[in-house]
Amino acid sequence: TYNYSLTNNFTDINKLAQGYVFSNYNSLFSGNRYLENSTSQVHSLRYFKYNMFNFENIFATVSYSKQVDAIKNKSLLTGVNQVSSAVNINSAFADESLSGSGNYGRSFAKYYKANVRASLNWNKFNNIRVYPDSDANPNNNPTEIQTTESFNHSYTIGFSTNYKTIPNLGLSYNYSISDNFSDVIYTDSP
C-alpha cells in the first residue's frame, strides 16, 4: 500500500504579533508578521503477507518525509538573557527523515517460531545559529544554518516455543547502532 500526503503547516498566531513578548523573566520573543506556512510531504509504502499454512508472516514499511520552508526559532543568548524570533528557513535547507523496517517470522516443526527484524532511521534537521553583535536584536545578527544528521539501525533475531499446555520459552538478540555523525553508540542486548 502506498500513501502520499501533502500538508500545509501554519504557525501559532502569537508568533506573528509584531513587537516583544515576555516569555519568561529573562526571555523575550519578537514576533514576525512575514511568516508563511511550511509545507510537509510524506510518502509511505507498506507490505504485509501472512500464510496460514506455515504461519509465515512478512511485514515491511518505508516512510520518507520532507518539510520545506519550516518555521524555526532563532535565539540570541546574551549572558543569561535570551531574545528569540521565528523565521522561515530557506527551502534549500529542508528537514528530512527516512525510516524503514522489515520483519520475517515463521513457525516450524509444529512447536517452534523464529523471526528476524531490521529497522533503519535517518534524520536531517536544520537549525539557525545566531552570533552576537553589538546590539540585542536577533533579526540583524549574523546567522548560520547548522545541519544535524543521525542514522540509527537495529537488528533483532528471535526464537520461541509455541506449546499449548506447558510454559513457553523465548530467546532474542538485538544489535543496534546509533550514529549522530559525531558519536557512534553500539548496543548489544540478549
Model-derived features with residue positions:
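Exposed, low-structure sequence patches enriched in small/polar residues
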Residues: T1-P190
